[in-house]
Amino acid sequence: MIRWLHISDLHLNDGNFSSARLRDELPSFLKDKRMKCDYVFCTGDIRSANVRPNSFTEDMANYMRNICHAVGAPMERLFIVPGNHDVNIFAEGREDAIKHILPYDGYYKPDYGHIDTVDLEKLQSGKEDFVGFLSEFYDTDRVGLYKDCNNPHFSIETPDFNVLHVDTTLVYSQSGKATDLLVGLEKLYTVVRKLNQEKPTILLTHYPITSLLQEERRLLSNVLQMNNVRLWLAGHEHDHNLQKMKYLDSLQAGELHYETDANATILIGEYDSENYQCRVCAYTWMGRVSNY
């Protein structure tokens, strides 16, 4: 049995009393329940961009190490994608590039899926701090995958899965809208078509598929189906959620941050490679009455 931990929306620099508690209690809970995991998946928002200070810190890197240690997963089995809060939306040239790309007034057409290289470079500038954070615990080759502005999406093949990293924050803009996003299908397809079809694929990203531009979503859904991608792991909405979209199971973890109208939730997934069965359990922090 292969097991993974899925966490999301940590917002580690936003530390109210209950948020600090639930984060501190998570490693102990995982150890006490002997939740050994082979992988840890983090679907973004390590920090809160709208809280000052909002820089990535060594304490944040140490928290990721503590989580991996609690479930017995080595750091190279930690897989992360950026969330919208991890991106500097005010990076020079980024907003202009987004306006140039978006299909309402820009050149992007989902049927072609093309984003100009010069615009990809400007979009990448918003991830410099995030990439610096990853360098605290990843080796140079791993960090290099996130630095490659010409290839914003990539896959890492493990002994058990293809872990397909998809950057759905690519054109997240200063407007804050998250219903007309796009991924650049041309670049994504170059990765998807090379997936090892002998292994299951886990797609890791920040936003649910419903956040994409309608035509982008339709075309991507078809590509995923044709290439046997069945599991979409995301976050963003600060609540655990399962959306069944035909062949695709879209699972969202909750947050590791306390809010009145949201759920601080982690997901534990299990996959039996012999009978191809998968099970996912949600654990929610109930701080007023108990632990997780």
For the regions a language model picked out, list residue spans one by one.
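Active-site neighborhood of phospho(di)ester-bond hydrolases with catalytic His/Asp-centered motifs
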Residues: 6-8, 38-45, 73-84, 166, ...
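Active-site environment of divalent metal-dependent phosphoester hydrolases
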Residues: 11-16, 47-51, 81-95, 173-174, ...
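Short, solvent-exposed aromatic-acidic interface loops
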Residues: 204, 280-291
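N-terminal active-site segment of His-dependent metallophosphoesterases
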Residues: 1-59, 63, 67-78, 88-89, ...
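Conserved beta-sheet core of the metallophosphoesterase superfamily
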Residues: 117-120, 212-281
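Active-site-proximal segments of metal-dependent phosphoesterases and phosphodiesterases across multiple
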Residues: 169-231
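Extended active-site neighborhood of metal-dependent phosphoesterases/phosphodiesterases
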Residues: 59-178
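Beta-strand-turn-beta hairpins that frame and shape the catalytic cleft
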Residues: 1-5, 151-165, 200, 244-249
